[in-house]
Amino acid sequence: MRLRRIKTLIVDDSLLFRETLARGISRDPAIEVVATAVDAFMARDMIIKYKPDVMTLDVEMPRMSGIEFLRRLMPQYPLPVVMISALSESVFDALNAGAIDFVAKPDMNRNRDLDSFFSELILKIKIASVARLGRRAEVSKLLPTGKSQADQGWVIAIGASTGGPEAIYQIVKNFNQDTPGTVIVQHMPAGFTRMYAERLNDTCVVEVKEAQNNDQVKMGQVLIAPGEYQMRLKQKAGNYMVECHPGEKVNGHCPAVDVLFDSVAQSAGARAVGIILTGMGSDGARGLLAMRKAGARTIGQDEASCVVYGMPKVAYELGAVEKQYPLNYIGQALYKLINQL
């Protein structure tokens, strides 16, 4: 029996790039490019005519930007969208407007960059085709813990992939200065992790920064693993630090959640809370199991609230997750755990 192909609409104002995209993703037999469009208005007509399963969308376009198009489209016609973006903070506006994920634009003059780009884009189109679209629930606030020095010996570790930037924001935005030091791996390319950290820092009470080698893990601070670097937690002179080094991909990712979680299990043991959020694949499941075996408390995002119920599902089936919660309850569950520490 032949499986149904993923009907894909390409939206980009460059004729050359549209044609290159169409050729590149059509090489995968699971994907069918049903139409291309030069701008948002043509895209609207193509959506009505072809009813695509997934749309790729440029951020910068004439007449109407990709972000504005998303804001108008999603309430009326929810559709899985993968953004194609140059290195720009606007990609996070697109994710906030409802895009599932993004891919960084390649150097068109380098075949190696193009091959890597198409492999990533094809994978993300496939992930988007099974992603769950829906309205975001309001997240309960993480209240002050009333703790001080005791929390300095504790660490919160979070891992996420597809759908993660928004999920992480919904949790971290309610952190306060009494929240234990937090380390996060979000699958994201180099450059974008710095902009994501800066964006969170501008909108959250706690300090959020892209981690650098030998940064200390502090209360009321969040460290985001830099793209193309593996981040590990280490204990030195009674303090937690992070080591960030370029490394090989693990589970297809650098940074990888498993690398972080394994190091948290080794360095923090029972003095940690691990949280695995939305994302495709299995990254983080094995590391979260190591954390739980070391005595850490572990939380998984539930299926109903995930954009893609992959990583949390594998972790849950592996026995790594102590309890699953909807995204809008994870903050409250974390608050309760912190007060039990």
Swiss-Prot record:
<keyword id="KW-0963">Cytoplasm</keyword>
<dbReference type="InterPro" id="IPR008248">
    <property type="entry name" value="CheB-like"/>
</dbReference>
<dbReference type="InterPro" id="IPR000673">
    <property type="entry name" value="Sig_transdc_resp-reg_Me-estase"/>
</dbReference>
<dbReference type="GO" id="GO:0000156">
    <property type="term" value="F:phosphorelay response regulator activity"/>
</dbReference>
<dbReference type="GO" id="GO:0006935">
    <property type="term" value="P:chemotaxis"/>
</dbReference>
<keyword id="KW-0145">Chemotaxis</keyword>
<dbReference type="Pfam" id="PF00072">
    <property type="entry name" value="Response_reg"/>
</dbReference>
<feature type="domain" description="Response regulatory">
    <location>
        <begin position="7"/>
        <end position="120"/>
    </location>
</feature>
<feature type="active site">
    <location>
        <position position="161"/>
    </location>
</feature>
<comment type="similarity">
    <text>Belongs to the CheB family.</text>
</comment>
<dbReference type="InterPro" id="IPR011006">
    <property type="entry name" value="CheY-like_superfamily"/>
</dbReference>
<comment type="function">
    <text>Involved in chemotaxis. Part of a chemotaxis signal transduction system that modulates chemotaxis in response to various stimuli. Catalyzes the demethylation of specific methylglutamate residues introduced into the chemoreceptors (methyl-accepting chemotaxis proteins or MCP) by CheR. Also mediates the irreversible deamidation of specific glutamine residues to glutamic acid.</text>
</comment>
<dbReference type="InterPro" id="IPR001789">
    <property type="entry name" value="Sig_transdc_resp-reg_receiver"/>
</dbReference>
<keyword id="KW-0597">Phosphoprotein</keyword>
<feature type="modified residue" description="4-aspartylphosphate">
    <location>
        <position position="58"/>
    </location>
</feature>
<keyword id="KW-0378">Hydrolase</keyword>
<feature type="domain" description="CheB-type methylesterase">
    <location>
        <begin position="155"/>
        <end position="341"/>
    </location>
</feature>
<feature type="active site">
    <location>
        <position position="187"/>
    </location>
</feature>
<protein>
    <recommendedName>
        <fullName>Protein-glutamate methylesterase/protein-glutamine glutaminase 2</fullName>
        <ecNumber>3.1.1.61</ecNumber>
        <ecNumber>3.5.1.44</ecNumber>
    </recommendedName>
</protein>
<feature type="active site">
    <location>
        <position position="283"/>
    </location>
</feature>
<dbReference type="GO" id="GO:0050568">
    <property type="term" value="F:protein-glutamine glutaminase activity"/>
</dbReference>
<dbReference type="InterPro" id="IPR035909">
    <property type="entry name" value="CheB_C"/>
</dbReference>
<dbReference type="GO" id="GO:0005737">
    <property type="term" value="C:cytoplasm"/>
</dbReference>
<dbReference type="Pfam" id="PF01339">
    <property type="entry name" value="CheB_methylest"/>
</dbReference>
<dbReference type="GO" id="GO:0008984">
    <property type="term" value="F:protein-glutamate methylesterase activity"/>
</dbReference>
